[in-house]
Amino acid sequence: MAKEIIFSDEARNKLYEGVKKLNDAVKVTMGPRGRNVLIQKSFGAPSITKDGVSVAKEVELKDSLENMGASLVREVASKTADQAGDGTTTATVLAHAIFKEGLRNITAGANPIEVKRGMDKACEAIVAELKKLSREVKDKKEIAQVATISANSDEKIGNLIADAMEKVGKDGVITVEEAKSINDELNVVEGMQFDRGYLSPYFITNAEKMTVELSSPYILLFDKKIANLKDLLPVLEQIQKTGKPLLIIAEDIEGEALATLVVNKLRGVLNISAVKAPGFGDRRKAMLEDIAILTGGEVISEELGRTLESATIQDLGQASSVIIDKDNTTIVNGAGEKANIDARVNQIKAQIAETTSDYDREKLQERLAKLSGGVAVIKVGAATETEMKEKKDRVDDALSATKAAVEEGIVIGGGAALIKAKAKIKLDLQGDEAIGAAIVERALRAPLRQIAENAGFDAGVVVNSVENAKDENTGFDAAKGEYVNMLESGIIDPVKVERVALLNAVSVASMLLTTEATISEIKEDKPAMPDMSGMGGMGGMGGMM
């Protein structure tokens, strides 16, 4: 297929058109008074969302060059969501503002490479200031405030997440599911999660969620590889008689053994699944022992003189349920005795106190969280499926933002932190580098401008008032239309969200500004179908009878 090559300003202007269209669709969702976006689906009912990344992912433009620009910024939104869980709209609005301002300067003759260098230096300085402005999340109230802001000012969701985090701790596992009723619920169940997924997608029991869900399974723990099926046969025969599911956790399962397990699963002979044991070396042995204590089972270990053939049902652990996706396994309500679990927890605490290695301490704390923390399940309720999906997206966002806040701390929200950080930086740059830094500094006003515009206020007046406020915690509460102390009003953002949004926005905008040529496919028009009207209904074929 023929390709079209476009250079310099013409190429950048086309890319900008795509970025602008994406930004126009995403920016309307920003702030407490942001609007919804209705998205047509190829099948089923349309979805309604106020989630920036959900909107960005749906934007596909007809013009291939414009679509290239839009797709780069779409990637920024996705990456920001993956890294920080929120801030996708902020990243998109910042990327657009930086690209727009940069384009004007480069068209006027500024050197793109020097401009990029200045932008990077300004970004680095602002990130450093944001870290200085941040402070730790102190209590449950602040956790609820962060979650509420990220869930589009839904206090009920904010309080649910704060309750969940209080019950399982900041290192605990919190999952989000759909409720069977219209009410939101929080269930906390004892459980353990580790980062190993199913060994074969053929084990999946829930095709919609792509997960394996086992109810009241037996759990076989083995510390070596399983390659030969005959070693497994005795215990499999015992399991088949009980009719219960089986989860095998081993160093690996390969070849004939895995193939036979898959065949038995597909034929319905056994409800079975298998995952690799978590960790490596001595840490793997310790984690297998943790799982054994939690589930009331034994680790079948050749070092202890046990072979897989000698395993019986009495050696197997049990749990009320096990959920496995492609990356993680969660064991819920292990059948282990509480006294044994408490003894193991105390043993790990003693090891944490004794160790001098930061890495070992971190891994021991992970094991402690898995053993002592439970699994919190937030069940989201709604009246319709469309509302359910929109609400579940908001809860997922709020949960990620809350974890980010606990991890790196909080700053004042509503776009004010970026403006306060801008006021504090002092860069000594010359020429086009200074222009690059000024572009980023001017763009930092964009999130607050957009929040004010969406709420129906004069953006210029709002930005000016926040910039000139004497108290560094003063910002604009768009929901009430007032200038307030953002910390006291609970309008706060995780510093990680602001930091990641800015870094990603500067990265993609500088990439677009230093683009000098674009290569895209030329869409060829398909030839029209030939005119069939002259055939006269094939009347001339009547003589063939």
Swiss-Prot record:
ATP binds at residues 29-32, 50, 86-90, 414, 477-479, 493. GO terms for molecular function: ATP binding; ATP-dependent protein folding chaperone; isomerase activity; unfolded protein binding. It is an enzyme of class 5 (isomerase). CDD domains: GroEL. It comes from the Bacteria. Keywords: ATP-binding, Chaperone, Cytoplasm, Isomerase, Nucleotide-binding. GO terms for biological process: protein refolding. InterPro entries: Chaperonin_Cpn60_CS, Cpn60/GroEL, Cpn60/GroEL/TCP-1, GroEL-like_apical_dom_sf, GROEL-like_equatorial_sf, TCP-1-like_intermed_sf. Its EC number is 5.6.1.7. It catalyses: ATP + H2O + a folded polypeptide = ADP + phosphate + an unfolded polypeptide. One of its GO terms (cellular component) is cytoplasm. It is found in: Cytoplasm. PROSITE patterns: CHAPERONINS_CPN60 (PS00296). It holds the Pfam family Cpn60_TCP1. NCBIfam families: GroEL (TIGR02348), PRK00013.1 (NF000592), PRK12849.1 (NF009487), PRK12850.1 (NF009488), PRK12851.1 (NF009489). Forms a cylinder of 14 subunits composed of two heptameric rings stacked back-to-back. Interacts with the co-chaperonin GroES. Belongs to the chaperonin (HSP60) family. PANTHER family: 60 KDA HEAT SHOCK PROTEIN, MITOCHONDRIAL (PTHR45633). Together with its co-chaperonin GroES, plays an essential role in assisting protein folding. The GroEL-GroES system forms a nano-cage that allows encapsulation of the non-native substrate proteins and provides a physical environment optimized to promote and accelerate protein folding. This is Chaperonin GroEL. It comes from Campylobacter jejuni subsp. jejuni serotype O:6 (strain 81116 / NCTC 11828). The gene is groEL.
